[in-house]
Regions:
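Signature of N-terminal electron-transfer/Fe-S-associated modules in redox systems
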Residues: 1-163
Length: 163
C-alpha cells in the first residue's frame, strides 16, 4: 500500500468515527478488512500504512493480522477454500477433504492454482462440528457435509463462475 486511495481513506475515516477519538486504534480490524477488500490481501506495507493512520506501533497491527485467519497475508486466488482440519472434522474426513481438493486442483495446502482461481488451505475450527467436514469459501460462505462428490461439484461450479 504505497499510498492510501481517497476511497480507502474515506472508509477508514468512517470506521474511526465509530469510536472515541482517543480510541481510534479500535478500528484496526475494520481497517485491515478494508485493505483486504481493496487489495485482496494484507501486505506488511499495508500493515504499516494502517499503523500510521491509527497511530499504532506496526507490530501491534501485525499481531492482529497474524492472530486472525480471516486476513490473507499473501495473495490468494479468486476463490479461497478453507477446509476445517480440527479434530471433529478430522474424525469425519476433514483431512481427506483437504487432500482431495489439493489433489484435484494440483496444489499443496496453502497453494494457489497457476490460473489464480483457487487457493486451498487448512483452517482452524469453523464452528460447525456437527456438519463436518466443513469448508468456508472466501471467508463468507460455509458449506457442510463436504464429501468428495460435493467437493468436485463445488470446484466445477466455482470454475464456471471464475472471472
Amino acid at each position: 500500500m504505497t499510498q492510501m486511495s481517497d476511497e480507502m481513506k474515506r472508509r477508514f475515516d468512517a470506521e474511526v468515527a465509530k469510536y472515541p477519538a482517543e480510541q481510534k486504534q479500535s478500528a484496526v480490524m475494520a481497517c485491515l478488512a478494508i485493505v483486504q477488500q481493496e487489495q485482496g490481501w494484507v501486505s506488511a506495507e499495508a500493515e504499516n500504512g494502517v499503523a500510521a493512520y491509527l497511530g499504532m506501533p506496526p507490530i501491534a497491527v501485525h499481531e492482529v493480522t497474524t492472530f486472525y485467519n480471516m486476513y490473507n497475508q499473501q495473495p490468494v486466488g479468486q476463490f479461497k477454500l478453507n477446509v476445517c482440519t480440527n479434530l471433529p472434522c478430522q474424525l469425519r474426513n476433514g483431512e481427506t477433504a483437504l487432500q482431495h481438493l489439493c489433489g484435484k486442483l494440483g496444489v499443496e495446502p496453502y497453494g494457489t492454482t497457476a490460473d489464480g482461481v483457487f487457493t486451498v488451505q487448512p483452517s482452524e475450527c469453523l464452528g460447525a462440528c456437527a456438519d463436518a467436514p466443513v469448508l468456508l469459501v472466501n471467508d463468507r460462505q460455509m458449506l457442510s457435509y463436504m464429501s468428495e462428490p460435493r467437493l468436485d461439484e463445488l470446484v466445477e461450479t466455482l470454475k464456471a463462475a471464475a472471472k
